[in-house]
């Protein structure tokens, strides 16, 4: 058996932190686990990430954006996610296909039926077992990310994930993304686990761990190497 867990949420929701904490917890318990992200996680995906998130690429067409994200996902599924799941491991992914529906579908107004066809091709129909949604309003999440970016060093741009081209869009765009997530959750409630992102990091990590725990009984732990 294997387990595929994804983390979704608006900008500044803390999903990346929670994905990392769950990875560290499972790794410490000797479970076969990897942590990856979208876009990225592969050499090709990381190159695409630089292109789609670069603040200077304001001329990018919505269709190009949608296809680039999907291309990065296709490479990640083929190179990393599917092979590890086939070995019986646990894959934790910071964003997955739901992000494309929320950001490019609802956010940019792309046709959802078209997105379903493209996503099916990119993923081969691979769906997460659990998707955590860290719930915070678009306005509050963006303010969190602005504060975090202000504390970071270095120039904001292609090499800095603290503030990117999608973050820089108007608040109304991010509110459409937030509303889109709620539509996705309502359409598939058994897969989604909605958590209040305004809680402490520790409280969220404890809740996520408790939700994942029942799924671990079927996962074979790694042997201790002496």
Swiss-Prot record:
Q: What is this protein called?
A: Thymidylate kinase
The alphabetized list of GO BP terms reads:
dTDP biosynthetic process; dTTP biosynthetic process; dUDP biosynthetic process
Organism annotation? Roseiflexus sp. (strain RS-1)
Q: Which residues form the signal peptide?
A: none
UniProt family annotation: Belongs to the thymidylate kinase family.
The task this protein performs is described as: Phosphorylation of dTMP to form dTDP in both de novo and salvage pathways of dTTP synthesis.
Q: Recorded GO terms, molecular function?
A: ATP binding; dTMP kinase activity
Query: Does the keyword Magnesium feature in the UniProt annotation?
Result: no
